[in-house]
């Protein structure tokens, strides 16, 4: 979710001549989000920023397709940004660059704006390799939050991109309660949390994008590991 930080472009971007809401900005945001698997978002973001600063071509779909093999992607990308699953990230990086080149003129912005209907846009995002409900929802939130597409509607029909931290928060706040003394398997309740948080937002007429930001702040900084127990 730290990919939204890229709306406030830092020195790395300025040195590379990157303007806010430009194609390069979109490429960085899209490819960075692909690595949000079991990695603390702030660390992921910083490593991706360093990689972009040293070699922005690694985020350019045309260049990726024409120049990188899977082994290259593992060595030059996955290992540099500390991917939990280096081979899988490399496969996703290459495959998704191919999709962007073939269907969106190598420009993620065309994909971001391919529909204003959130349900269709999330379906498009999830058609990319390695993008499921969580990462798709995270990218959707970033697309809206950064301003790449300000006309998205039906957001209330898209599930909130939660993870184990959000599930843990639900129990910590007693939004979820189970009637036994066994240690809770928080992973088991992630999907339920996703559905219930969306229902609560819709009942209260609250945009889940705002709730998701609050949950991320709590989950990533205040409710991690033994801090929640």
What is the predicted function of each stretch?
Residues 143-229:
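Accessory, usually C-terminal, subdomains that scaffold auxiliary metal cofactors
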Residues 52-146:
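Alpha-helical ds-nucleic-acid-binding substructure associated with the helix-hairpin-helix region
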Residues 29-33, 76, 120-124, 165, ...:
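A general alpha-helix detector
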Residues 22-31, 89-90, 136, 162-163, ...:
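Short runs of predominantly hydrophobic/aromatic residues within well-ordered alpha helices
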Residues 2-13:
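Single conserved hydrophobic/aromatic residue that forms the stacking wall/gate
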Residues 14-72:
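Extended cationic-aromatic binding surfaces that line active-site or macromolecule-binding grooves
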Residues 18, 22, 36, 81-88, ...:
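Conserved aromatic-histidine-acidic binding/catalytic patches
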Residues 19-43, 95-98, 141, 168, ...:
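Short, hydrophobic/amphipathic alpha-helical patches that form generic packing surfaces
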